[in-house]
Amino acid sequence: FVVDPIFYPGGDIGDLAINGTVNDLACCGARPLYLTAGFILEEGLPLADLQRIVQSMKRAAERAGVQIVAGDTKVVERGKCDKLFINTSGIGIVPPGIRIAPDQATPGDVVICSGPIGLHGITILSARESLGFETDLKSDTASLNIMISELLHTIGEVHVLRDPTRGGVSGTLNEIAQDAGVDILLDEDALPIPEAVRAASEMLGLDPLYIANEGLVLVILPESRAEQALPLMRGFEESRQATVIGRITKQSGEQARVKMKTLYGNYRIIDMLSGEQLPRIC
Protein backbone atom coordinates (compact mmCIF):
# COMPACT_ATOMS: atom_id res chain seq x y z
CA PHE A 1 0.00 0.00 0.00
CA VAL A 2 1.54 3.27 -1.16
CA VAL A 3 -1.31 5.78 -0.81
CA ASP A 4 -0.33 9.45 -0.83
CA PRO A 5 -1.05 11.19 1.52
CA ILE A 6 -0.76 8.65 4.32
CA PHE A 7 -3.45 10.45 6.36
CA TYR A 8 -6.67 11.67 4.73
CA PRO A 9 -10.32 12.29 5.64
CA GLY A 10 -11.92 9.00 6.61
CA GLY A 11 -8.78 6.96 7.12
CA ASP A 12 -5.05 6.43 6.68
CA ILE A 13 -2.62 3.99 5.10
CA GLY A 14 -2.91 1.71 8.15
CA ASP A 15 -6.60 0.90 8.13
CA LEU A 16 -6.52 0.92 4.32
CA ALA A 17 -3.93 -1.89 4.38
CA ILE A 18 -6.03 -4.00 6.73
CA ASN A 19 -9.37 -3.33 5.05
CA GLY A 20 -7.98 -3.89 1.57
CA THR A 21 -6.55 -7.30 2.40
CA VAL A 22 -9.61 -8.39 4.38
CA ASN A 23 -11.90 -7.39 1.51
CA ASP A 24 -9.80 -9.25 -1.04
CA LEU A 25 -10.18 -12.43 1.00
CA ALA A 26 -13.89 -11.85 1.63
CA CYS A 27 -14.54 -11.37 -2.10
CA CYS A 28 -13.11 -14.86 -2.67
CA GLY A 29 -15.80 -16.17 -0.33
CA ALA A 30 -13.24 -16.70 2.44
CA ARG A 31 -13.51 -15.95 6.14
CA PRO A 32 -10.38 -13.83 6.82
CA LEU A 33 -8.35 -15.04 9.80
CA TYR A 34 -4.71 -13.92 9.87
CA LEU A 35 -2.67 -11.09 8.39
CA THR A 36 1.01 -10.21 8.20
CA ALA A 37 2.36 -6.69 7.73
CA GLY A 38 5.71 -5.50 6.40
CA PHE A 39 6.69 -1.83 6.73
CA ILE A 40 9.16 0.10 4.57
CA LEU A 41 9.93 3.30 6.46
CA GLU A 42 11.67 6.39 5.15
CA GLU A 43 14.46 7.72 7.33
CA GLY A 44 13.07 10.60 9.38
CA LEU A 45 9.45 9.41 9.54
CA PRO A 46 8.08 10.76 12.85
CA LEU A 47 7.55 7.95 15.35
CA ALA A 48 4.24 9.57 16.29
CA ASP A 49 3.02 8.99 12.72
CA LEU A 50 4.11 5.36 12.83
CA GLN A 51 2.38 4.83 16.17
CA ARG A 52 -0.81 6.45 14.88
CA ILE A 53 -0.82 4.18 11.83
CA VAL A 54 -0.14 1.01 13.82
CA GLN A 55 -2.97 1.87 16.22
CA SER A 56 -5.25 2.42 13.23
CA MET A 57 -4.30 -1.02 11.92
CA LYS A 58 -5.06 -2.54 15.31
CA ARG A 59 -8.54 -0.99 15.40
CA ALA A 60 -9.29 -2.05 11.82
CA ALA A 61 -8.18 -5.63 12.54
CA GLU A 62 -10.37 -5.76 15.64
CA ARG A 63 -13.39 -4.50 13.71
CA ALA A 64 -12.83 -7.13 11.02
CA GLY A 65 -12.24 -9.90 13.56
CA VAL A 66 -8.79 -10.81 12.23
CA GLN A 67 -5.39 -11.14 13.90
CA ILE A 68 -2.11 -9.56 12.76
CA VAL A 69 0.22 -12.46 13.51
CA ALA A 70 3.56 -11.30 12.08
CA GLY A 71 5.30 -8.11 11.04
CA ASP A 72 8.61 -6.69 9.92
CA THR A 73 10.16 -3.26 9.42
CA LYS A 74 12.86 -1.96 7.13
CA VAL A 75 14.23 1.59 7.07
CA VAL A 76 15.58 3.12 3.85
CA GLU A 77 17.50 6.35 3.27
CA ARG A 78 15.65 9.62 3.01
CA GLY A 79 14.24 9.99 -0.50
CA LYS A 80 14.27 6.24 -1.26
CA CYS A 81 10.69 5.83 -0.03
CA ASP A 82 7.89 8.35 0.39
CA LYS A 83 7.27 8.29 4.15
CA LEU A 84 5.84 4.79 4.53
CA PHE A 85 4.82 1.77 2.45
CA ILE A 86 2.98 -1.24 3.89
CA ASN A 87 2.83 -4.76 2.45
CA THR A 88 0.18 -7.11 3.81
CA SER A 89 -0.68 -10.75 3.21
CA GLY A 90 -3.74 -12.58 4.47
CA ILE A 91 -5.04 -16.09 4.98
CA GLY A 92 -8.67 -17.13 5.22
CA ILE A 93 -10.82 -20.24 4.96
CA VAL A 94 -13.42 -20.76 2.24
CA PRO A 95 -16.40 -22.65 3.70
CA PRO A 96 -17.55 -25.82 1.90
CA GLY A 97 -19.92 -25.22 -0.98
CA ILE A 98 -18.84 -21.63 -1.69
CA ARG A 99 -17.99 -21.02 -5.36
CA ILE A 100 -17.34 -17.33 -5.95
CA ALA A 101 -15.62 -16.38 -9.22
CA PRO A 102 -15.99 -13.77 -11.99
CA ASP A 103 -16.81 -16.44 -14.57
CA GLN A 104 -19.91 -17.43 -12.58
CA ALA A 105 -21.87 -14.35 -13.75
CA THR A 106 -24.95 -15.63 -15.59
CA PRO A 107 -27.63 -14.00 -17.78
CA GLY A 108 -30.55 -13.11 -15.53
CA ASP A 109 -28.28 -12.07 -12.65
CA VAL A 110 -28.39 -8.54 -11.26
CA VAL A 111 -25.50 -6.34 -10.11
CA ILE A 112 -25.78 -4.84 -6.63
CA CYS A 113 -23.49 -1.99 -5.58
CA SER A 114 -23.10 -1.79 -1.81
CA GLY A 115 -22.77 1.99 -1.50
CA PRO A 116 -21.73 5.37 -2.92
CA ILE A 117 -19.29 5.35 -5.84
CA GLY A 118 -16.03 7.31 -6.10
CA LEU A 119 -15.58 8.55 -2.52
CA HIS A 120 -12.09 7.20 -1.88
CA GLY A 121 -10.41 8.29 -5.10
CA ILE A 122 -11.79 11.84 -5.04
CA THR A 123 -10.95 12.22 -1.33
CA ILE A 124 -7.34 11.14 -1.92
CA LEU A 125 -6.91 13.41 -4.93
CA SER A 126 -8.40 16.35 -3.07
CA ALA A 127 -6.19 15.82 -0.01
CA ARG A 128 -3.07 15.33 -2.15
CA GLU A 129 -3.59 18.42 -4.28
CA SER A 130 -5.26 20.57 -1.57
CA LEU A 131 -8.37 21.01 -3.72
CA GLY A 132 -10.72 21.49 -0.78
CA PHE A 133 -13.26 18.80 -1.74
CA GLU A 134 -12.47 16.87 1.44
CA THR A 135 -14.67 19.27 3.40
CA ASP A 136 -17.63 17.42 1.83
CA LEU A 137 -16.09 13.99 1.27
CA LYS A 138 -14.26 11.26 3.13
CA SER A 139 -12.88 7.90 2.10
CA ASP A 140 -15.24 4.93 2.22
CA THR A 141 -12.51 2.57 3.47
CA ALA A 142 -14.08 -0.23 5.51
CA SER A 143 -13.86 -3.97 6.00
CA LEU A 144 -16.82 -5.77 4.42
CA ASN A 145 -16.15 -9.33 5.52
CA ILE A 146 -18.80 -9.55 8.25
CA MET A 147 -21.54 -8.31 5.92
CA ILE A 148 -20.34 -10.59 3.11
CA SER A 149 -20.20 -13.60 5.43
CA GLU A 150 -23.79 -12.99 6.50
CA LEU A 151 -24.83 -12.56 2.86
CA LEU A 152 -23.24 -15.86 1.84
CA HIS A 153 -24.68 -17.68 4.84
CA THR A 154 -28.21 -16.34 4.34
CA ILE A 155 -28.54 -16.05 0.56
CA GLY A 156 -26.16 -18.80 -0.48
CA GLU A 157 -26.62 -18.35 -4.22
CA VAL A 158 -24.10 -15.54 -4.78
CA HIS A 159 -22.16 -15.85 -8.03
CA VAL A 160 -19.62 -13.00 -7.98
CA LEU A 161 -18.13 -10.69 -5.34
CA ARG A 162 -15.64 -8.02 -6.35
CA ASP A 163 -14.33 -4.89 -4.64
CA PRO A 164 -13.98 -2.16 -7.29
CA THR A 165 -10.69 -0.64 -6.18
CA ARG A 166 -8.16 0.31 -8.87
CA GLY A 167 -10.06 0.80 -12.14
CA GLY A 168 -13.30 1.51 -10.29
CA VAL A 169 -16.72 0.06 -11.03
CA SER A 170 -16.14 0.19 -14.78
CA GLY A 171 -12.83 -1.67 -14.72
CA THR A 172 -14.19 -4.34 -12.39
CA LEU A 173 -17.34 -4.97 -14.41
CA ASN A 174 -15.34 -5.15 -17.64
CA GLU A 175 -13.11 -7.82 -16.11
CA ILE A 176 -16.18 -9.79 -15.00
CA ALA A 177 -17.79 -9.46 -18.44
CA GLN A 178 -14.64 -10.76 -20.15
CA ASP A 179 -14.13 -13.63 -17.68
CA ALA A 180 -17.75 -14.80 -17.90
CA GLY A 181 -18.28 -13.93 -21.58
CA VAL A 182 -21.44 -11.95 -20.80
CA ASP A 183 -22.88 -8.52 -21.54
CA ILE A 184 -23.60 -6.26 -18.57
CA LEU A 185 -26.10 -3.40 -18.78
CA LEU A 186 -25.93 -0.59 -16.23
CA ASP A 187 -28.67 1.92 -15.47
CA GLU A 188 -27.19 5.41 -15.11
CA ASP A 189 -30.20 6.59 -13.13
CA ALA A 190 -29.55 3.88 -10.51
CA LEU A 191 -25.85 4.62 -9.95
CA PRO A 192 -25.27 5.85 -6.36
CA ILE A 193 -22.83 8.66 -7.17
CA PRO A 194 -22.81 11.39 -4.47
CA GLU A 195 -23.39 14.89 -5.80
CA ALA A 196 -20.04 16.04 -4.36
CA VAL A 197 -18.23 13.25 -6.24
CA ARG A 198 -20.10 14.07 -9.43
CA ALA A 199 -19.27 17.78 -9.16
CA ALA A 200 -15.59 17.18 -8.36
CA SER A 201 -15.28 14.67 -11.20
CA GLU A 202 -16.80 17.07 -13.72
CA MET A 203 -14.44 19.83 -12.58
CA LEU A 204 -11.40 17.54 -12.92
CA GLY A 205 -12.48 15.82 -16.13
CA LEU A 206 -12.85 12.42 -14.46
CA ASP A 207 -15.53 9.73 -14.73
CA PRO A 208 -16.74 8.44 -11.32
CA LEU A 209 -17.15 4.95 -12.77
CA TYR A 210 -13.35 4.70 -13.17
CA ILE A 211 -12.49 6.09 -9.72
CA ALA A 212 -11.20 3.74 -7.00
CA ASN A 213 -13.30 2.71 -4.03
CA GLU A 214 -12.07 1.08 -0.81
CA GLY A 215 -15.26 0.17 1.05
CA LEU A 216 -17.43 -1.03 -1.80
CA VAL A 217 -18.39 -4.46 -3.11
CA LEU A 218 -20.20 -5.45 -6.29
CA VAL A 219 -22.46 -8.45 -5.73
CA ILE A 220 -23.77 -10.46 -8.67
CA LEU A 221 -26.54 -12.93 -7.93
CA PRO A 222 -29.83 -14.20 -9.42
CA GLU A 223 -32.52 -11.52 -9.67
CA SER A 224 -34.82 -13.71 -7.57
CA ARG A 225 -32.39 -13.37 -4.65
CA ALA A 226 -32.01 -9.58 -4.81
CA GLU A 227 -35.19 -8.92 -2.85
CA GLN A 228 -33.72 -10.87 0.06
CA ALA A 229 -30.15 -9.62 -0.33
CA LEU A 230 -30.84 -5.88 -0.36
CA PRO A 231 -32.49 -5.57 3.09
CA LEU A 232 -29.78 -7.78 4.58
CA MET A 233 -27.00 -5.60 3.15
CA ARG A 234 -28.75 -2.39 4.17
CA GLY A 235 -28.75 -3.64 7.75
CA PHE A 236 -24.98 -3.01 7.89
CA GLU A 237 -23.62 0.53 8.16
CA GLU A 238 -21.02 0.02 5.42
CA SER A 239 -23.66 -1.15 2.91
CA ARG A 240 -26.79 0.71 4.01
CA GLN A 241 -27.12 2.33 0.57
CA ALA A 242 -26.93 -0.95 -1.36
CA THR A 243 -28.86 -0.83 -4.62
CA VAL A 244 -29.25 -2.68 -7.93
CA ILE A 245 -27.28 -0.85 -10.64
CA GLY A 246 -27.51 -3.25 -13.55
CA ARG A 247 -27.96 -6.77 -14.85
CA ILE A 248 -26.31 -9.52 -16.86
CA THR A 249 -28.20 -9.50 -20.16
CA LYS A 250 -26.79 -12.22 -22.39
CA GLN A 251 -23.96 -14.62 -23.13
CA SER A 252 -21.60 -12.97 -25.64
CA GLY A 253 -18.33 -14.89 -25.51
CA GLU A 254 -15.36 -12.87 -26.72
CA GLN A 255 -17.64 -9.97 -27.73
CA ALA A 256 -18.67 -9.33 -24.11
CA ARG A 257 -19.24 -5.65 -23.34
CA VAL A 258 -20.39 -3.38 -20.54
CA LYS A 259 -23.02 -0.87 -21.63
CA MET A 260 -25.00 1.80 -19.82
CA LYS A 261 -28.49 3.11 -20.42
CA THR A 262 -28.06 6.85 -19.97
CA LEU A 263 -30.43 9.35 -18.42
CA TYR A 264 -31.51 10.28 -21.96
CA GLY A 265 -32.51 6.73 -22.86
CA ASN A 266 -29.67 5.97 -25.27
CA TYR A 267 -26.83 3.50 -24.71
CA ARG A 268 -23.15 4.05 -24.14
CA ILE A 269 -20.31 1.53 -24.13
CA ILE A 270 -18.29 1.52 -20.90
CA ASP A 271 -14.77 0.47 -21.89
CA MET A 272 -11.76 -0.45 -19.80
CA LEU A 273 -9.69 2.59 -18.87
CA SER A 274 -6.44 2.93 -20.79
CA GLY A 275 -3.67 3.67 -18.27
CA GLU A 276 -4.20 4.71 -14.66
CA GLN A 277 -6.49 7.63 -13.89
CA LEU A 278 -5.25 8.31 -10.35
CA PRO A 279 -1.88 6.90 -9.20
CA ARG A 280 -1.16 6.00 -5.57
CA ILE A 281 -4.74 5.90 -4.36
CA CYS A 282 -4.27 2.68 -2.37
What are these regions (language model features)?
Residues 32-34, 65-67, 83-89, 109-112, ...:
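Structural motif
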Residues 1-113, 119, 124, 133:
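Glycine-rich phosphate/pyrophosphate-binding loop regions near the starts of catalytic domains
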Residues 221-226:
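Helix N-cap motif at beta-to-alpha junctions
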Residues 235-282:
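Acidic, Ser/Thr/Pro-rich beta/coil linker or hinge segments at domain junctions
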Residues 42-44, 137-213:
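Active-site-proximal betaalpha loop/short-helix elements
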Residues 28, 61-62, 77-83, 102-106, ...:
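Solvent-exposed alpha-helices and their adjacent loops that cap or buttress functional pockets
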Residues 21, 57, 173, 197, ...:
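Aromatic/hydrophobic pocket-lining residues that form π-stacking "cages" and hydrophobic walls in ligand
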Residues 147, 229-232:
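Hydrophobic side chains in well-ordered alpha-helices
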